[in-house]
Each structure stands twice: as C-alpha cells, then as structure tokens.
C-alpha cells in the first residue's frame, strides 16, 4: 500500500491548520481591533442598531477584542452556522459589554453582562444561532430584556 498520498494530504492539512492558527493568533496579539467587517442594521423596538457582522470563524474568534470604545448605537452580531449553546468570554476585550443571546426569530433568550478582560464563560440559556454584543447598559437603559425582539435581515423568515 502506498502511503505517500496519505502523508502528503496529512501534511497539507496540518500546514493549513497551522497557517489559520498563526493568522488568528497574529491578529489577536497585534492588538488590532476588527473595524472593517460587513455591517447590517438591526432594530430593537424603536431603537436602531448599527452592527458589524462576525460570520466567519476567525471573525467570531476575535470579536470586539482590542476595542477601546464603541459608539452607543453600535454593536457586533455573531452569526453561527447552526443553533447551539453559545459561550462567550472577554479575553483581550477592553470595554464592558452585554451579550444578548438571540433565537432565529429574533427573540432574546437571555442577556449576560460581561466585564473587561474576564475569562469566565457567559453562555446562552438554550441553543441560539446569534449573539449581539452591545455596550454594557445599552439594553437595560432601553428596557430591552429576555423575550424582547430584535429585527433585521438576519431574522427574516427563511424560505
């Protein structure tokens, strides 16, 4: 049996994995925030939210790390391929945030206040596909809580 093709494929796969890890690690250690992600407009009742969309693995992994500030009407929407119990931490995140764990129909399942640089996990109460991070206090100041609805393109019914 010729193992050369298997070894070659294994080495290529390992090289690709290491390159991805290196790219992500360099972005995180460089201390550069992600500022050029695609954007979409969401609404929470009468309130407009300008969100960056982190839909790819490496975008979700970096999230809002290294940001020193964020305008009050802005946030980041994390989009996962499938609903699941999503857990977030605040490694390298310098601003206090609240994570809204959001179901496919836009209903907020639960909220979690998160402190800067805290590496404790904050998880969804049930499987969700979306997590919306906003400045801490934004949801509370607008009386938006679990059961409230977020609307916008990501939450439109799928055919």
Question: What function would you assign to each model-found segment?
Answer:
Residues 22-25:
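N-terminal signal peptide c-region/cleavage motif recognized by signal peptidases
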Residues 28-159:
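Compact, glycine-rich, soluble single-domain proteins
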Residues 2-13:
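Bacterial N-terminal signal peptides that target proteins for export
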């Amino acid at each position: 049996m010729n193992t050369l093709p298997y070894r070659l494929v294994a080495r290529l796969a390992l090289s690709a994995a290491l390159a991805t890890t290196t790219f992500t690690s360099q972005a995180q250690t460089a201390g550069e925030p992600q500022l050029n992600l695609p954007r979409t407009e969401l609404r929470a009742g009468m309130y407009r939210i300008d969100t960056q969309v982190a839909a790819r693995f490496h975008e979700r992994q970096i999230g809002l790390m290294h940001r020193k500030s964020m305008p009050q009407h802005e946030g980041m929407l994390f989009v996962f391929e499938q609903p699941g119990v999503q857990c977030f931490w605040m490694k390298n995140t310098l601003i206090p945030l609240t994570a809204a764990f959001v179901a496919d129909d836009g209903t907020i399942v639960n909220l979690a206040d998160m402190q800067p640089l805290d590496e404790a996990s904050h998880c969804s109460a049930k499987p969700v596909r979306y997590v919306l991070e906003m400045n801490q206090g934004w949801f509370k100041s607008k009386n938006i809580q679990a059961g409230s609805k977020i609307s916008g393109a990501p939450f439109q019914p799928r055919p």
